[in-house]
Amino acid sequence: MRNKKFPFSDAPNTACFTCCHVLEKNKPILYVSHDEDGYWQFLCGGNHKEEDARVVSLASILNIDETMGDLAELDYGECAEAESTTSDWIVSRMNK
């Protein structure tokens, strides 16, 4: 991460969820959600089992992909999806 101001309103050490595919298999992050309860999820967009979940800090996510800072303004209950790393993000409200 560069010496830019931290883009999220949450602290850099805020716990968030990712998947083993992003963390251990270097898959790109293609699904991001800012859940109603305040939790962030940064996932590969694939199918997941409970054992695929990993907990990391927001700062760690930015170290994996600094472009995630572009989604720091997602409101509670919003998600963003992309088809690939070169696609535009499509932001929508999550279904309750």
For the regions a language model picked out, list residue spans one by one.
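Acidic, proline/glycine-rich low-complexity IDRs
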Residues: 1-96
